[in-house]
Amino acid sequence: MPPIPHVRPENVLRRAEELIAVGQPAAALSVLHEHVTSKRSRSSPIASLEPVMLLFVELCVDLRKGKSAKDGLYQYKNIAQNTNVGTIEMVLKKFIELAEQKVTEAQAKADEIQSSLESAAPTSNVEDLDAIETPETILLATVSGEQSRDRTDRAVVTPWLKFLWETYRTVLEILKNNARLEVMYQATALQAFQFCLKYTRKTEFRRLCELLRNHVQNAAKYSAQMHAINLSDPDTLQRHLDTRFQQLNVAVELELWQEGFRSVEDIHTLLNLSKRQPKNIMMANYYEKLTKIFMVSDNYLFHAAAWNRYYNLLRQSAIALAAGQGSKKDSPSVTEADMTKAASFVLLSALSIPVISTSRSRGALVDVDEVRKNKNTRLTNLLGMPQPPTRASLFKDALNKGLLSRCRPEIRDLYNILEVDFHPLSICKKISPILKEIGADPEMEKYVLPLQQVILTRLFQQLSQVYESVELKFVHELAHFPEPFQVTSSMIEKFIMNGCKKGDLAIRVDHVSGVLTFESDIFSSAKALHPGSAAGSAESEVGSVQRLQSTPAEIARSQLARLAKTLHVTCMYVDPSYNQARIKAKEAAHARARAGAAKEHEETLTRRAIIEKRKEALSDALQKKQREEENRKRARNQQLQEAEQQRLLDEHRERERKRMKDEQDRIRQQELKKQLEELKTGVKGIDVNQIDLEELDSNRLRAIKLAQLEKEKNDLNEKIRITSKRIDHLERAFRREELKHLPEDYETQKKQDLETYEQTKEETLKAARQKHKEDVALKHRLSRLVPYFNDFKKSVTEKRHEEFERRRKAADREFEQKKKQRIKEVHERIRRERAEREAEEQRRREEEERIAREEQERIAKEEERRRALAEEKAAREEQRRKLDEQAIRQRQREEEAEQRRAARKAGLAEPRGPAREASPERTAPRLNLAGRTGTSWRDRQAAKAAASAGEQPAAAQEATPAPPAKAGSYLPPHLRATRDGPSDSRDLSHARESAAPPRQFSRSPVPPSGAPSSQEKPGPWRPRFKQQQ
């Protein structure tokens, strides 16, 4: 059956355009959405579906129907992803461009509204130019001045921003985990990042990052699907890395440090998966963003480590470029100024690392703190360092690479003051000019506060080595910093309390006497009593603090060690053999060490050779395995493609079959429902809900309808009969009873009507009097306004009249213009109709001539056919006549031959006996031998044949007897049968069969020539089928 209307994409597109033209875009969108999401559209060609999708996304954007767009785009992706990926990218790009265009238009509209409000505000509401700033205007500006822009944005721009965000999210969901659409996916993600950055959408940026993270996590889960992305592919992984680096940049720009840190973790995960070495420029950006993240999180140790890694990368890139081993495109541009700046930041960040712990709890004192350990391990892995960094290791690495010679002079002086020549009494005087220079630099200003913490820590550690107690005033004088970095007494006390709380310091503050007392319990195990240990600090190396002298606690703790050293020196002087034995043992140990080193060296060489061989074997095996894996993967992919093609073909066939079946079922159901609705509305008493549509057909429905109509007709007739009978009797009884009460009811009704009339009359008169009084009072009250009303009415009338005249003239002009245009259109239409009529008349004449010409040709062909049939019929008649004549002549010849054969038989059989004449068998010729008495065996056989010949049919007796042959004359061999015996009967039968059609002849004796024949003379010849009838 033909498809229903508007199934083809061209018809749907035409219908949607018609609906848009009449101002019904919602209906057009509904038509397009129904067609796009329909299963029938899967079999439509992509070239015809593409314009439909373009119009569909345009309407979705205009009407802000994000969900409808998502459904349609998902369906279109499933249809086109196996055939044409370019059309999917084009439609999605169009979708994003339209959404971005709407946002731009909304912004322009909001700016226009705001500018109009701002330009209209000073003039429209100002009544006195001398008093512009009235209390009312000030209050209005205070209440709504700053919020008008926000309200305008919320009403105009925000809905389109929300729709644009939904657009990006929808496109990313459609393109996710598809290798053929991967480039478009990455480009859309970058556009979404720019959207978040341009409009400062922090919440949407967090959701976008989480969405991309989920897509990468699900990539491994759906790796078995067709067109799934492969993160092992270097190009794919590089594109994901570029996206994550852009994500990190946007997170830093938006100051979303938590998202930035998660982005760093994502980048680190992808770098671990990558088999290709990442570009230096990317890693430089990576470490640079890490420095910002660690600085915001107050993690100065890993902030300095990130700067160290960044400087190392710049140094290696510069060395590689100088040696010509690297590409300038993949390496960051490095100048001497950049290296100096990076070196200064490396050293300054390392100096800013706190000497003591900066955590707010005492939990950092626990060395086995798993949380801190795990965190440091994660951060170390992010930086790509083999072990967690420390303050001392960072200084050591910086000194080994000569950063002191590269950094700025003030940073070098700061390092010497803090780490080389630290003097607590002159520290602030030396460091003040350096802090001023650092504070003047906006990028280095953030390091001033941690440097103050380091200086205070060094100061109190060295004071605790020299003094047991100091005055607060003395400490304040020592900790004097330049403005605006001045440290107050409260800040110093807060620092002391924080250090004591964490166990890094052991100081008591006496506010009464203004004295700081350092704890000196020699038997205490607190780490604060052992300055320089720095157990809770960022470094673990002992001796980072300059040792001035040993404290009593250290002296008590190292007493046994000092006693052991003294006894050892005494033994060396008292017993010289002890020293000699020690020297010999040392030399023997050195000899064993040299021998072991040589042997270990040989073993190392051997092991290295073995390892190289194993590496080569492993590399060969791995390459072989990779080749086999690639071959298997290629074969598997080919099988999957063939299976997928077969599956798609089967699915297409199944869909077509199912579509045809569903279409037939739908049409049948529609017809049945339509008939049921007609039955429901036309016939009462039928419960349509109880009828099963699956088991219903038109015949049963017709039978149900006829049965119900018959039932209704019978019920109606019965009701009419019963009702008519009841009404007749009841009405007669009512009227008889009513006659008794009619006069009384008439009098009562007349009295009630009179009373009602009087009451209504009185109420009407009273209401009229009251209304008249009120109207008179209103007239006197309003009469004063009549002159003003008349003046106003006159002015309004004049204005209306002028407006009327103006509009009437405009209408007249427009009427004349329309009239001329209408006249022109009518003339054009008449001319066009006349041309069409002439063309139609010409076409009709040509059609009539063509029909007449075809009729003549048909008549001529019919005459020719009849003439040919007549000739053919005459030829057949002539041939049939010739055949009949031939048959008659043949029959005559056969009859003559029969007569001659019969005559010959009759003439030759007379001198023979009856027994010999009746013998049907052929015998040998008689010999002239001596006679004998009795009958021979031939005579007996002839007698038997004669006896049996009487039972044969009489057909053989039809032949006419031939004249007898003369005695002694010659007879041919085929005519000797009747004279010498029946020996030639078979030859005669064979001759008859060859001369005429086969007939049945009798072998009975031929009667004499004078005997009458039992058969009449045969008539004319007839065909055999007529003879058989």
Curated annotation (Swiss-Prot):
Pfam family membership, one: eIF3a_PCI_TPR-like
GO terms under cellular component: eukaryotic 43S preinitiation complex; eukaryotic 48S preinitiation complex; eukaryotic translation initiation factor 3 complex, eIF3e; eukaryotic translation initiation factor 3 complex, eIF3m; multi-eIF complex
Keyword set, alphabetical order: Coiled coil, Cytoplasm, Initiation factor, Protein biosynthesis, RNA-binding
InterPro entries for this protein: EIF3A (IPR027512), eIF3a_PCI_TPR-like (IPR054711), PCI_dom (IPR000717)
SMART domains the record matches: PINT (SM00088)
Domain PCI: 339-523
GO BP annotations, alphabetical order: formation of cytoplasmic translation initiation complex; translation reinitiation
Chain intervals for the UniProt region annotation (Disordered): 621-666, 797-1029
Superkingdom, natural source: Eukaryota
Localization: Cytoplasm
Biased composition (Basic and acidic residues): 621-632, 644-666, 797-901, 913-924, 977-993
GO terms, molecular function: mRNA binding; translation initiation factor activity
Compositional bias segments (type: Low complexity): 943-960
Coiled-coil regions listed: 92-121, 606-903
Family: Belongs to the eIF-3 subunit A family.
HAMAP family, per the entry: eIF3a (MF_03000)
Functional description taken from the UniProt entry: RNA-binding component of the eukaryotic translation initiation factor 3 (eIF-3) complex, which is involved in protein synthesis of a specialized repertoire of mRNAs and, together with other initiation factors, stimulates binding of mRNA and methionyl-tRNAi to the 40S ribosome. The eIF-3 complex specifically targets and initiates translation of a subset of mRNAs involved in cell proliferation.
Subunit structure: Component of the eukaryotic translation initiation factor 3 (eIF-3) complex.
Protein name: Eukaryotic translation initiation factor 3 subunit A
Species the sequence originates in: Coccidioides immitis (strain RS) (Valley fever fungus)
Upper lineage: Eukaryota, Fungi, Dikarya, Ascomycota, Pezizomycotina
Gene that encodes the chain: TIF32
